[in-house]
Amino acid sequence: MQPFRLHRGVVAPIDRENVDTDAIIPKQFLKSIKRSGFGVNLFDEWRYLDHGEPGQDPASRRPNPDFVLNQPRYRGASVLLARRNFGCGSSREHAPWAIDQYGFRALIAPSFADIFFNNCFKNGLLPIVLPEAQVARLFDEVAAFPGYELTIDLERQVVVKPDGDELAFDVEPFRRHCLLGGLDDIGLTLRHADKIRAYEAERLLRKPWLANTLAS
């Protein structure tokens, strides 16, 4: 998992409340057994004028020119600005996969759905909760200034605006530690690889019959 320490990026606004996971990545794209390739279908039903199916070439489809991510001013955006209760609905981990694979590194909203919030951290995304008034102000500034960028400093836990104004946010210490170190669940487990190997060796000494069981 890619570490997250300091990130600066263009902000793309999704100006809707209660954006659910089916809007983030529609259900027909959940059939894939792979964990990659979801970014091209992020916000698929808003992003395209035609109905999409798994494996379809995005170049053959009709983009919706009015949707935020199709507008030139938001090209290359890596910070997603949203309204309250973002990520509600069914608990599909494909939603943060799609957001990450599109190229977003952080999300800012007044609130997130709990399961989606947890899944973001597990997949290297930083969901930032700010007061609603601050989020509303950011929406105004993004609309007023094309190419609007924010700098997100996870070590200091601040969002830095173009004018230097800083917005403080909180991240639970263990989650902050994992993001700073680029540690997902597998990475955390591998940090104890020596202890795991030592335990397995000691267990086989005590219970040698397990060797045949494990080999089969």
UniProtKB/Swiss-Prot annotation:
Q: SUPFAM superfamilies in the record, alphabetically?
A: LeuD/IlvD-like (SSF52016)
Q: Name one GO cellular component term.
A: 3-isopropylmalate dehydratase complex
Instruction: Tell me which Gene3D superfamilies the record gives.
Output: Aconitase, domain 4
The EC number of this protein is 4.2.1.33
**A Pfam short name:** Aconitase_C
Task: Write the record's keywords in alphabetical order, separated by commas.
Answer: Amino-acid biosynthesis, Branched-chain amino acid biosynthesis, Leucine biosynthesis, Lyase
| A GO MF term | 3-isopropylmalate dehydratase activity
Q: In which pathway does it act?
A: Amino-acid biosynthesis; L-leucine biosynthesis; L-leucine from 3-methyl-2-oxobutanoate: step 2/4
List where this protein forms a coiled coil.
none
Q: What class of enzyme is it?
A: lyase
Q: Which InterPro entries match?
A: 3-IsopropMal_deHydase_ssu, Aconitase/3IPM_dehydase_swvl, AconitaseA/IPMdHydase_ssu_swvl, IPMI_Swivel, LeuD
Example of a GO biological process term: L-leucine biosynthetic process
User: Which reaction is recorded as catalysed by this protein?
Assistant: (2R,3S)-3-isopropylmalate = (2S)-2-isopropylmalate
What's its job? Catalyzes the isomerization between 2-isopropylmalate and 3-isopropylmalate, via the formation of 2-isopropylmaleate.
Its family remark reads:
Belongs to the LeuD family. LeuD type 1 subfamily.
- What interactions and quaternary structure are annotated? Heterodimer of LeuC and LeuD.
Q: What is the name listed in the Swiss-Prot or TrEMBL entry for this protein?
A: 3-isopropylmalate dehydratase small subunit
Query: Which species does the entry assign this protein to?
Result: Methylibium petroleiphilum (strain ATCC BAA-1232 / LMG 22953 / PM1)
Gene symbol here is: leuD
